């Protein structure tokens, strides 16, 4: 069974993820990114998709042109888990050159 993070665990893990914010009304986190153009955004999404498939843990995301909005939560646990934190860290590394989304 997948362990849902406690409030204290969540707080501690999110201290290392300053680009991520809590989703109102859900036990989830989100990040908005903006890239130079669609090709850069799609390349980023492809890298994340490959990692997500390897983890068997898939983000909720939305893409329009150069913007990518990502939400992470573990449906099996009905909330945030270590899997979300691991994927968020990967996403941060893959998006190192992206700008905060508007």
Swiss-Prot record:
Disulfide links within the chain: none
An example Gene Ontology molecular-function term: 4-alpha-hydroxytetrahydrobiopterin dehydratase activity
EC numbers: 4.2.1.96
GO biological process: tetrahydrobiopterin biosynthetic process
Pfam families in the cross-refs: Pterin_4a
Lyase as UniProt keyword: yes
Keywords linked to the UniProt accession: Lyase
UniProt-listed InterPro entries: PCD_sf, Pterin_deHydtase
Domain of life where this protein originates: Bacteria
Reaction catalysed by this enzyme: (4aS,6R)-4a-hydroxy-L-erythro-5,6,7,8-tetrahydrobiopterin = (6R)-L-erythro-6,7-dihydrobiopterin + H2O
Family: Belongs to the pterin-4-alpha-carbinolamine dehydratase family.
Name this protein carries in UniProt: Putative pterin-4-alpha-carbinolamine dehydratase
Organism annotation: Burkholderia orbicola (strain MC0-3)
Lineage start: Bacteria, Pseudomonadati, Pseudomonadota, Betaproteobacteria, Burkholderiales
